[in-house]
Amino acid sequence: MKKLILLIRKYISYAKDLANKNTTNYERFKNWMHAYIAYKSNESKFNPTYLPKYEQGQIIFVDFGCGIKHEFSYPHYAIVLNAHDRKKNDLLTVVPLTSKKPKHNQLKNWEHEIAYPIQNLLVDKVTNDFNLYNTKYTELRDKIIELGKIGPTIDNHEFTKQYSKLIEIGVNEIYANNKDILEFADKMSKGSIVETNQIKTISKSRIIFPTKKSHPLYDIKVHPSDLSIIQYKLVNHLVADTNKIDITK
């Protein structure tokens, strides 16, 4: 019991010190401690079979937890590396994905900038999936039909005003139904960097989304050419120098 009390005191002391030095890191640390306790509390109940199978190259949002020094930490997007995931498998190997920053103007050997913009993949996904006849947009569809009927009876100014309002409502509804994916698109607007030196095997319980096939991010995958480069960098810079491998042996 004394050891537990000492541990709690150390935690409180560290948390207070962190709060005084860096409020952002303090909030992240505090949130992670809550999440970690929840993960451990539900550890025996977690069942990966309720999650969909994840495909190689697929993009997911993961809580990496509180790391040390330069370890990737806290919620981040990542790319799935498993070639053959199974629903019963509770582990997944991923490589972190981060937004391009000024420091990435000169890439390290283990870094790769995604060639086909992820923002394009995401916006294409939202655009292609939009269907005015979807039940989510029933009210909006009915209002557009009604406006079309009364259009001839009102002046152009009033028609334009009501039409613009419906368009605004439509845009807001599309955003609300695809918030995760559109926020991700905005985050990656300047480019996306893969950090192959931060490859990590995680519990699937750390996946924030997508946890269902119906999630808008579920079937978003990096381009095959980008995946090939990522695989090459993983082998060349972490496993072995491919220039020194004698494949004739």
Short names for language-model regions:
Residues G57-I59:
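Loop/turn positions that initiate beta-strands
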Residues M1-H34, E43-S44, P52-E55, N105-K249:
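C-terminal terminal-subdomain/extension
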Residues S73-H84:
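Short beta-strand-centered aromatic/proline hotspots
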Residues V80-N82, P96, Q198:
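A residue-level detector for short acidic-glycine micro-motifs
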Residues F64-G65:
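Short, surface-exposed secondary-structure boundary micro-motifs
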Residues H76, N89-V95:
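Short aromatic-glycine-enriched beta-strand elements
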Residues P48-K53, K69, A83, A185:
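Short, surface-exposed secondary-structure edge patches
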